[in-house]
Amino acid sequence: NSQSVSSEHFYLSDDELPRYFSAGKKHRMEAFYRKMRQRFAILMDSDGQPEGGQWNFDANNRNKLKASDLPSVPQPLVFSNDVSAILERLKRHNIKTMGQAHSSLLWPVNRQQAKELLDYFCRYCLPLFGTFQDAMTGRLKQRGNNRQWSLYHSRLSFALNSKIISPQLVVDTVLAHYRAQQGQLLCAEPRIDIAQV
């Protein structure tokens, strides 16, 4: 049995969702995304229109990584969190798991690490996140470089899903960084990241 409950972690409460997703109709995330931007005044101008004059820049995020782009791909910020005690506890209690676990976890495990990763994303990855959002490459591995495996992605989903940080914090931080760097970032970059959140 499962039960749905509301959480302050989300922008909408559980009982508000039916207003945005009527039963029996087809829905597009783009339409929902626009409604959320309007409701919460995210990247909207004073006339209620999207900043920059358009809702999305999806056509701009389908670029392929060329060999000349690879040297500028940032090395991901990773952590070295010792989880050996947790692994031992799982083993001691015969808890079955999927996959293979290592004694060092590279994901953030507390708010400080999650905020550090968010700040790192804004500083090093956000400027080209939109440009290469959908890009994939095996070239880095072919060159013996596994350090840049995450390309320009934030890798914040673990911190968000485990509620270490909130979507509100991510959106506010990305917007603050965008406003501070306005002349240097394409208008597309924060929109694309915010849509992902």
Each model region followed by its residue ranges:
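Beta-rich, aromatic/charged-enriched effector core domains that present basic-aromatic interfaces
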Residues: 1-107
